[in-house]
Amino acid sequence: MNAFNSEKPRRFPAFTILLIIIVAGLAIGGYYLAPRFERNAPQITLTPDSDVLGVAPLEIVVTDQGAGLKSVTATLSVGGTEHNLAGEQYAEPVKEKKLTVAASKIAGIKEGPAVLRITARDGSLWGFFKGNETVVQKNLTIDVTPPTVELIADDRYINFGGAGAIVYKASPDTVTSGVRIGDYFFPGTKGQVKDQPEHFFALFAHPYNVPGSAKAVLVATDKAGNTREMALVYELKNVKYRKSTIALTDSFLQNKVVPLVKDADARQGAVKDVFVAVNKRLRKENEDKIAAITRKSTPAILWNGAFAQLSNSKVEANFADERTYTYNNQPIDSAYHVGYDLSVTKRYPVEAANSGRVVFTGDLGIYGNTVILDHGVGLFTLYSHLSSIEVKDGESIKQRQILGRTGETGLAGGDHLHYGVYLQGVAVLPVEWWDAKWIHDNIEPKLEGRSGEEIAKAQAPAPRKTTRKRGR
């Protein structure tokens, strides 16, 4: 018998080893395959979230950030007929799919109740390798008929760069309506026409920067995006706008232009380059801000009668003057002057042209200290280069109330008032609104509910007087 006991090496049973291998394999496989078994279903969003479908497109966005999309189908059932909008299978999963649907583009579609059904399945191995599925079903109404409009009263003549007004009716399904010309839109509002609460009244312009050949169109759009258009017919009276040249001096550039540049580095450049930057970039920023402010108006008329020119004032510069700026006798830039420059004496009291509400007070770049009044239904007046401001935002203003005093803030070359009139963000000819006869002939009859025939007769030029020679 040996003095020392010897033990045999411990062996793992083959079954245990096999089990370990299987578990390890499953763990490794699970690590790599787990994402393929993800349970996050695809997402489906509809924009806009509307219950009608017509001309306006409905955008369907299907996404899956996990395994990716494997298939997307979309159908639209209307009156027992099913229209296939999409039926796609993807060999390689995709993360996003966009579909655009417009009822007006579906051949043979009928109006009435409809059901939109979108089904999306991803490439996951979950659900016995079928993947995750999302189904969205939405009840809609198919509407491809545009609203109706009826023109009640319009203008026979409109000045180039000036304003016009119309009265019209639109069917109850209308959600937006007004006048479109070029890239500009002038919405109509209800409740302005005497004894006709359902009639729309719209002020609009034939802007100075829109070609005379451009046609104004009355448009009405419903919830489904269906649009009715009616051409407005009027004679466009030519208005000749001046061209002028302004010679820039070093003193003006250093004392007036350079301080308007906020960037210290930019102020160090050549003075003519600084001017061009101010005249282009800063002017555009300021005019964009004015346009944004003067596109948000109260839907009620706040003014009464003709607008008042600054008392005792002299016109120094006209509306839509095309100005060429020169430096050392060389043209370096140009711009349109979208208002009237009025001067009296230094620090002269600036009066409100008509009753309204203050919607802006403060510094406005090249315009300096500025007050903007909202007179309702898209009509605004602007008062710039003020040395002081004596009203506050939101304040109700009476005609001839003092707003501030004239000055030479901003890009003003001397003490004066820059006065502008705006319609829905568009600068228009101010002199019309100073003219009591123009308002009496073109605006007030429409607000009084007079017929188009009556207005046309009032606007017609007086017949020429003729003298017959007696025969011998």
Predicted regions and their residues:
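Catalytic cores of peptidoglycan-degrading enzymes
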Residues: F307-E454
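Surface-exposed loop/turn and intrinsically disordered segments
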Residues: N2-E198, L203-P211, V217-R242
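Non-catalytic extracellular/periplasmic "stalk"
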Residues: A163, A170, T176-D321, T326-N329
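Short, flexible, glycine/charge-rich loop motifs used to bind or transfer phosphoryl groups or to couple energy/partner
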Residues: D49, V62-T63, N304-G305, R347, ...
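Extracytoplasmic
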Residues: P113, V135, A153, A163, ...
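Contiguous, well-folded functional domains in the mature portion of proteins
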Residues: I158-F160, A170, S177-R180, T189-K243, ...
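Juxtamembrane/interface motifs at transmembrane-helix termini
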Residues: Y90, L248-S251, G449-G452
